[in-house]
Amino acid sequence: MEEHLFTTQGQAYRIRIAPAAEFATEIEAILAFLIPRAHVEEKYLRNHVPRALVLAVADFEGAIVSVCALKDVNHVHSESVRNSSGYPLPLDLPELGYAATNEHHFGRQLGRHLNEQIILRIKGEAFATVRVGNVAEERNIRRCHFCPRGQTWDRVDNGGKPYQIALWVRRANAPPICDGAPEGVT
């Protein structure tokens, strides 16, 4: 497991990055953090978080305050995304996702930093599905050289409220650092 400190706005966060298996003793705590913040059903989190290729976790004063994952390849999900978006998404790509930050730590660049840590470990293409209007996440993945592809599609959250999802794809030859312009398509 890799570990370092990330200091922002006078706060020091412990950042840990590793395959999900290395977080085995903490998976329940990670799930407890993600479940109330997720846009997907709990069963999907419980199934896929423990199998993530990479987890990036930020702790503050011993508590988890931000998480991001590089999900394992899931052909069934990828085919659903391909069909919903109308974009010819390869079925063997990992997905950047399950990004969440504790509300008391918004605006401190934690999501951006965790995304960057995962991007450094991606070999080849990857994709992300992002809720349309999630400005912070759209900005973060754009900086990491993801580009919107295909059409948006409708979903319904756990409370029955409709929303839209957009597909974003990162090319295999994209720079390994997140230095893209947040306002421009790269």
Where is each model-derived feature located?
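Short amphipathic alpha-helix that is part of the acyltransferase structural core
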Residues: 2-43, 59-60
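Active-site rim helix/loop that mediates acceptor-substrate recognition in acyltransferases
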Residues: 32-69, 74-76
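Conserved acyl-donor/pantetheine-binding loop and adjacent beta-alpha core of acyl/acetyltransferases
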Residues: 63-98, 106, 155-160
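Residue-level recognition of the GNAT/N-acetyltransferase active site
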Residues: 97, 102, 131
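Conserved acetyl-CoA-binding loop-helix of GNAT-fold acetyltransferases
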Residues: 101, 106-120, 139, 143
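Conserved GNAT acetyl-CoA-binding A-motif
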Residues: 120-133
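Conserved active-site alpha-helix within GNAT-family acetyltransferase domains
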Residues: 132-154
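C-terminal "cap" of GNAT-fold acetyltransferases
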Residues: 154-186
